Amino acid sequence: MKTRYEDDSLTLHTDLYQINMVEAYWKDGIHNRKAVFDVYFRRLPFGNGYAIFAGLERVIQYLDDFHFSETDLDYLHKEVGYGQEFIDYLRTIRFTGNIRSMVEGELAFGNEPLLRVEAPLAEAQIIETAILNIVNYQTLIATKASRIKQVVGNEVAMEFGSRRAHELDAAIWGTRAAYIGGFQSTSNVRAGKLFGIPVSGTHAHSLVQAYKDEYIAFNKYAETHKDCVFLVDTYDTLKSGVPTAIKVAKEFGDRINFIGIRLDSGDLAYLSKKARKMLDEAGFPNAKIVASNDLDEYTIMNLKAQGAKIDMWGIGTKLITAFDQAALGGVYKLVSIEDEKGQMTDTIKISGNPEKLTTPGMKKVYRIINKNNNKSEGDYITLDDENPQEEDRLKMFHPVHTYISKFVTDFEARELHQDIFKEGRLVYQLPNLQTIQEYATKNLELLWDEYKRSLNPEKYPVDLSQKCWENKMKNIEKVKQSFHF
């Protein structure tokens, strides 16, 4: 059977149970009641000390074009079995709500809202799957990229992962997220076109194999490409590859820009040191050594500890697949809903797993920045009607272990959420990708080094205001009393 993509909208990119719930709301007449959902994750990925928020641009694209196509509706009616009246209702759905969100490149931490959805219940429900799909993946990859870039430091980090990504869209949106996280280029030409990311690349072993001779292959490559990085490990790196690269570079002289060589196998620490010596002695002290071959932050850390002479890092599989953590685990939880009297009432989910307890109510997230050293003291979650900037002395305390507390003075309370959609209308001006990357990099300066350690980082504080904490406790008690816990 041929898969048909014509008239394929992303609106059906949802779980069946979302549509089932919408049908139940619609039949009961509560589908237009205002609802508020928070998007957040509970635990930081990779054991990291922070996350980098990404995915907002695609969320905007998704919501801005939110509608069921006629083929969507035909499928839901004929193949899934929804009734015609409900199908007619679905035909009218557009996103008419409000979105407040962190902007891309923002530092994010566990149990704080990344994004808040306020919309009629049916609309807010049906968009859950796609929003989580987008934000979970892109935030995961941006965070992985940032971890790697922290280890790479001032050297160049290049994204090489397309062939190992989980399908085509994962490759390009993962590349975009990696750029937000600090990578300087991508090998994916489509991502370069779509997002303006600088593209970079060398050549494969197949070039050398096609000519059966490194000298001929390097010559043919140099004849067609002025900027040359030769892959030197097809046969023997030190006996053949590096000497041949040097020979061709000398013969071509000023006719090419001999950028350097790439190592893709073997002991990268040993080979890079030997190759560096050979290049220097041949009169190419500025030639760069590029390394690839299943690299990640841990391998790079070890190579640096062993004195590897590597200038540029091509990272693929373990970046684009977030190799050591398959998913972020972001969730989408109802925190407030309009009742039959038209009043907003807070909702809470209580679980046998304490980490799954939600924080009810419409909230704001602030970053508390010490004015004396421009470092963050922690993030501070308040109810919607609070403004910590009005406080001269702010008490910050652990939301579970409340005896852990501190007072902060002389601070700036920076609100992390901005209006993205208001009543279904996009009100946010998307920055370009370079600006987002610069913002992410600048944000990292707010953190002490202890929070940025690759291994066993210090836990960053995410605290509730007294009022927000009391509201949470009140809602817990209300639920316990209603169910006679």
Where are these regions (language model features)?
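Short hydrophobic "strand-cap" motifs at the C-terminus of beta-strands
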Residues: 292
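N-terminal, Lys/Arg-enriched amphipathic/low-complexity engagement segments
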Residues: 35-91
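Gly/Ser/Thr/Ala-enriched C-terminal appendages of enzymes
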Residues: 2-33, 37, 46-48, 295-485
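Short amphipathic alpha-helical segments
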Residues: 55-58, 140, 432, 436
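Alpha-helix initiation/capping motif
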Residues: 15, 55, 68-72, 76, ...
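Short coil/turn segments at secondary-structure boundaries
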Residues: 74-75, 143-147, 161, 452-459
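Buried, small/hydrophobic-residue-enriched core segments of structured protein domains
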Residues: 2-34, 43-45, 81, 87-96, ...
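Hydrophobic residues within beta-strands of alpha/beta enzymes
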Residues: 200, 261, 289, 311-313
